[in-house]
Regions:
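Short amphipathic alpha-helical interaction segments
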Residues: 109-125, 130
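Short, loop-centered acidic/histidine patches that primarily coordinate divalent metals
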Residues: 79, 111, 133
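Preference for short coil/turn "hinge" residues that link or interrupt alpha-helices
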Residues: 4, 45-48, 121
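Short, cationic-aromatic polyanion-contact patches
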Residues: 130-141
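Short amphipathic alpha-helical interface segments
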Residues: 92-116
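Amphipathic alpha-helical interaction surfaces in cytosolic regulatory modules
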Residues: 19-44, 49-98
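A short acidic, often aromatic-flanked loop/helix-cap motif at beta-alpha or helix-coil junctions
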Residues: 12-13, 82-84, 106
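Extended, compositionally biased accessory segments flanking or bridging domains
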Residues: 1-25
Length: 141
């Protein structure tokens, strides 16, 4: 089962006011705790960052890196280049990887060793398959 999460909606529920930015560690912690309750026992989570204006390193660490200790596979969509700039160094620092749905398919973000493990897990769970070009395509969401 894939647990879907609208990160912007969770942010709105977690922090008073019309915030669209994931900044500060306390904000990240509040959002992550709500997400953890929503995805309890789900091995795969799907997080949509559409509507999130920006995310800083501390929130990327609190949300993405710490959730990867809870779920086996984390799928992200609606990720902008600005989001990537905060998320990628956090993944590198923790030797973790996530799967990003892009306009052209799937991309695994993280160090090569962690990325290879995530790709293998996607194939094993039949969440993705290899295309004729050798890339991965999502089969379930």
């Amino acid at each position: 089962m894939i647990a879907p999460i609208d990160v912007h909606a969770v942010l709105q529920e977690s922090v008073p006011g019309p915030y669209a930015a994931l900044v500060t560690r306390p904000t990240g912690r509040a959002v992550r705790e709500r997400i953890e309750r929503a995805i309890a026992d789900a091995p795969v989570a799907w997080m949509d960052f559409s509507g999130v204006r920006c995310i800083d390193y501390s929130c990327a660490d609190e949300i993405v890196a710490k959730l990867l200790r809870t779920v086996e596979i984390l799928l992200l969509k609606g990720v902008t280049e600005a989001h990537r700039l905060a998320i990628e160094p956090v993944l590198q620092g923790h030797n973790l990887a996530v799967v990003i749905l892009t306009g052209t398919g799937l991309e695994v973000l993280g160090p090569p060793e962690a990325a290879a493990l995530v790709c293998e897990e996607l194939l094993t769970r039949r969440l993705a398959e290899r295309t004729a070009g050798g890339t991965l395509a999502l089969t379930a969401a």
